[in-house]
Amino acid sequence: MRSLSSLSLALLAVALAIPVAPALPSSARAASPSAAAERFAIGRVQYTGGGDWYSNPSSLPNIQKQLSERVGIPTEGEERRVSLLDPNLFETPFLYMNGHGTVTFSDEEAERLRRYLESGGFLWADDNYGMDESFRPQMRKVFPDAEWIDLPFDHEIYHCFYDFPGGIPKIHEHHGGPAHGLGLFHEGRLVVYYSYNTDIGDGTEDVGVHDDPADKREMAMEMAMNVVVYALSH
């Protein structure tokens, strides 16, 4: 695990700076008392199409609690729920989406997600088993020319806080085969991380919700820390 002495301070500054194109002029944000008191929160994407965007309900609150305790980032107690057309989308620097079913982006939603990611935002998509069939085609609407890259084991996302020499861990056994950590890049920056065939969200839920052993649950939480730490530091 990385030393917290300088990393926590750096991540705190990034998290509270809101590194996405602001909805207000910078002068207005600087003068706003609420901006100064901002705490980091993960934004759960409320997508359409019929998929259960709300699945693993205890996962994000648990991740945010551990970000505070392990990394030292002040976090909100609950997740933020945002649609891609939400006026406050650009005030949320880190988005998360998961589910078992169909994901659909309208043309306007796809364009807005693209602008969000091009402006410094980050999306972590975690397939709960069943999302993949629609998610990747929908992301083609967002970045038509981008190709998914299976991130190599030496990528920094696997070593920035906790060390994963074998890449993303397999947490929940929905079907056989290895776990994959896939990325979409824009101008050399990783803007979308897609955890596929692993279900990190199952492993970060409350104890007893899923039949995952303690070591798998710990690996899931450590991987979640890495994804957020990486996103906030790049």
Where are these regions (language model features)?
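Aromatic-Pro/Gly-enriched surface loop or interdomain linker
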Residues: 24-94, 100-101, 191, 199-234
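Short alpha-beta junction capping motif
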Residues: 42, 94-133
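Bacterial N-terminal signal peptides
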Residues: 8-23
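Alpha-helical scaffolding within the catalytic cores
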Residues: 77-84, 106-112, 176-180
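Positively charged n-region of N-terminal signal peptides that target proteins for export
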Residues: 1-6
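An acidic, glycine-rich "communication" segment
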Residues: 50, 132-208, 214-225
